[in-house]
Curated annotation (Swiss-Prot):
UniProt-annotated site: Involved in binding to the cell receptor, residues: F138
Record's protein name: Envelope glycoprotein gp70
Cytoplasmic side: 646-688
GO CC terms in record: host cell plasma membrane; membrane; viral envelope; virion membrane
Reported impact of F138 to A/S: Complete loss of viral infectivity
Positions annotated as glycosylated: N127, N143, N498, N557
Source lineage: Viruses, Riboviria, Pararnavirae, Artverviricota, Revtraviricetes
Organism this protein belongs to: Mouse mammary tumor virus (strain C3H)
MF terms in GO: structural molecule activity
Membrane topology, Extracellular segments: 99-624
Protein modification: Specific enzymatic cleavages in vivo yield mature proteins. Envelope glycoproteins are synthesized as an inactive precursor that is N-glycosylated and processed likely by host cell furin or by a furin-like protease in the Golgi to yield the mature SU and TM proteins. The cleavage site between SU and TM requires the minimal sequence [KR]-X-[KR]-R.
């Protein structure tokens, strides 16, 4: 007890109490100390949850400020939609702490560069089908984004064209080329209505041009797919002429397999072949000049060689990509990837220049060309575009670029990269501590069956507590990379749902179908991708708790570097060294889904459930209660008899000890050691 200020003990000191009261007081103090120690131990073991602060207006302002900073950093114009998406990126996902699985995410809100090795056709619509051919762009649906910063990766060299004098590394330079074709004059007095003269059509078109060392005009023979016939066999002279002198020549989808010309991208490997030149090594100007009277005194362009004159029509510049150059003399080459409509997109970057037959002046024709969904054009200044090959991967970055779906003559000073929205990505997600299941009803039934197994009730409780401790311990030592790099399945599911609802898929469906056949085709293609996604979803076993993504039964190896997954999300799909081979991964998911088909025997499961419920019947527990009662009774009897037996045994041992002591004294003194009144004759004991 604390002392008084004067140093004398206080009136409540233990020294002033008598013995009995002092003992009671000390016992009370010891009891209080024990209670305090118990309370302290409980407090130390208690994990108090922090008090959640209510969301205040200051918090919302801070979030909006961070979202605005994200838009400023990415140079994205601030709109309600972009601000909403920026808020989604600012709000941090919950940390990962459980089992990870691969999730199938259809139509993700990301863009990947399209490589020259892409085998999917890129459709291009134009507003000048008379002079460019192809499909018409009736709907005029054009979009242009604000400035964005683009940074992705690609397995192959991305499709890139430079319309400026400056060409980024990995891009192709374009230039104006002359396309010539002649049609017959009209003479009704002649058989077939054809006159003796010819009318020459001159068209200046922007396409792959002569760029010095990057162009080889030496004819090379190549074996093309049967889809591209030889022009001289498939299209004869005047085959499409209908007697109209004002009708321009048609575009012919054919090739000259023995007249291939190769173009090389700046500072990169690979060749782009063009088989649309009838005479790549010989200037046809002299031949035209020698027949000047036949063509109505037509004079070919000055200081410009002519290599694209064909009498049946203008030959479409179908480009074929060769990823790894082989022997140029090898005719049996099958690795050519065709790109049939990209020339129309390049042609729209500048005005078409047309000289009609009999006219001295050239006509300037404005043209626009648009790519269809899911393709988009990334437009930027050449000096702000960087394409670098690191190992087997191409790293593409573009600062202050814009996304658009159409090109016209305003793009003359820019470079363009084709990008697309991938049909799906595979993303590792965490589903927490819950097991993977694809049927909620059966899983709930299993939970109930496990809970009612009477014989495992106590063991389940003990194992459950042990598992909980193990899980908490494993969470405490979880890797930092997994927590920082992987998102939870709930977060990804909600994000994809929000983005899907915010970025509505009604881009084209509202258009009038009766006058927009190409828009309808885009819708059909888009719906086809949706059907493909649904087919994949139906053929894959998915977690039942997530509706907007498909969490597959394939576990994700958390020990793998996150850079491999990041490379896939940035556009690498077929490189096992730095990313995942998505095709192999998809096949593995399909095989596991087939093996994971739920073969639950519902009748057997129901019988098991009924047996478990029957085991909980109190009448069936009577025998267990009887056995427990008999055991308890026997235990009580043993506990009651044990003290008596122990006491008797102790007395017997004391008597034996006394007798031994008396015997030893007699033997030592040779007489009676006990008083006469108490003498007792003991039997003789011999000791050996």
């Amino acid at each position: 007890m604390p002392n008084h200020q004067s140093g004398s003990p206080t009136g409540s000191s233990d020294l002033l109490l008598d013995g009995k009261k002092q003992r009671a007081h000390l016992a009370l103090r010891r009891k209080r100390r024990r209670e305090m120690r118990k309370i302290n131990r409980k407090v130390r073991r208690m994990n108090l949850a922090p008090i959640k602060e209510k969301t205040a207006w200051q918090h919302l302002q801070a979030l909006i400020f961070e979202a605005e900073e994200v838009l400023k950093t990415s140079q994205t114009p601030q709109t309600s939609l972009t601000l909403f998406l920026a808020l989604l990126s600012v709000l941090g996902p919950p940390p990962v702490s459980g089992e990870s699985y691969w999730a199938y995410l259809p139509k993700p809100p990301i863009l990947h560069p399209v490589g020259w090795g892409n085998t999917d056709p890129i459709r291009v619509l134009t507003n000048q089908t008379i002079y460019l051919g192809g499909s018409p762009d009736f709907h005029g649906f054009r979009n242009m984004s604000g400035n964005v910063h683009f940074e992705e990766k690609s397995d192959t060299l991305p499709i890139c064209f430079s319309f400026s004098f400056s060409t980024p590394t990995g891009c192709f330079q374009v230039d104006k080329q002359v396309f010539l074709s002649d049609t017959p004059t009209v003479d009704n007095n002649k058989p077939g209505g054809k006159g003796d003269k010819r009318r020459m059509w001159e068209l200046w078109l922007t396409t792959l041009g002569n760029s010095g060392a990057n162009t080889k005009l030496v004819p090379i023979k190549k074996k093309l797919p049967p889809k591209y016939p030889h022009c001289q066999i498939a299209f004869k002279k005047d085959a499409f002429w209908e007697g109209d002198e004002s009708a321009p020549p048609r575009w012919l989808p054919c090739a000259f397999p023995d007249q291939g010309v190769s173009f090389s991208p700046k500072g990169a490997l690979g060749l782009l072949w063009d088989f649309s030149l009838p005479s790549p090594s010989v200037d046809q100007s002299d031949q035209i000049k020698s027949k000047k009277d036949l063509f109505g005194n037509y004079t070919p362009p000055v200081n410009k060689e002519v290599h694209r004159w064909y009498e049946a029509g203008w030959v479409e510049p179908t480009w074929f990509w060769e990823n790894s150059p082989k022997d140029p003399n090898d005719r049996d080459f099958t690795a050519l990837v065709p790109h049939t409509e990209l020339f129309r997109l390049v042609a729209a970057s500048r005005y078409l220049i047309l000289k009609r037959p009999g006219f001295q002046e050239h006509e300037m024709i404005p043209t626009s060309a648009c790519v269809t969904y899911p393709y988009v054009i990334l437009l930027g200044l050449p000096q702000l575009i960087d394409i670098e090959k690191r190992g087997s991967t191409f790293h593409i970055s573009c600062s202050s670029c814009r996304l658009t779906n159409c090109l016209d003559s305003s793009a003359y000073d820019y470079a363009a990269i084709i990008v697309k929205r991938p049909p799906y990505v595979l993303l590792p997600v965490d589903i927490g501590d819950e097991p993977w299941f694809d049927d909620s009803a059966i899983q709930t039934f299993r939970y109930a069956t496990d809970l009612i197994r009477a014989k495992r009730f106590v063991a389940a409780i003990i194992l459950g507590i042990s598992a909980l401790i193990a899980i908490i311990t494993s969470f405490a030592v979880a890797t930092t990379a997994l927590v920082k790099e992987m998102q939870t399945a709930t977060f990804v599911n909600n994000l994809h749902r929000n983005v899907t609802l915010a970025l509505s898929e009604q881009r084209i469906i509202d258009l009038k179908l009766e006058a927009r056949l190409n828009a309808l085709e885009e819708v059909v293609l888009d719906l086809g991708q949706d059907v493909a996604n649904l087919k994949t979803r139906m053929s894959t076993r998915c977690h039942a708790n997530y509706d907007f993504i498909c969490v597959t039964p394939l576990p994700y190896n958390a020990s793998e570097s996150w850079e491999r997954t990041k490379a896939h999300l940035l556009g690498i799909w077929n490189d096992n060294e730095i990313s995942y081979n998505i095709q192999e991964l998809t096949n593995l998911i399909g095989d596991m889904s087939k093996q994971h088909i739920d073969t639950v025997d519902l009748s057997g499961l129901a019988q098991s459930f009924a047996n478990g419920v029957k085991a909980l019947n109190p009448l069936d527990w009577t025998q267990y209660f009887i056995f427990i009662g008999v055991g308890a009774l026997l235990l009580v009897i043993v506990l009651m008899i044990f003290p008596i037996v122990f006491q008797c045994l102790a007395k017997s041992l004391d008597q034996v000890q006394s007798d031994l002591n008396v015997l030893l004294l007699k033997k030592k003194k040779g007489g009676n050691a006990a008083p006469a009144a108490e003498m007792v004759e003991l039997p003789r004991v011999s000791y050996t």
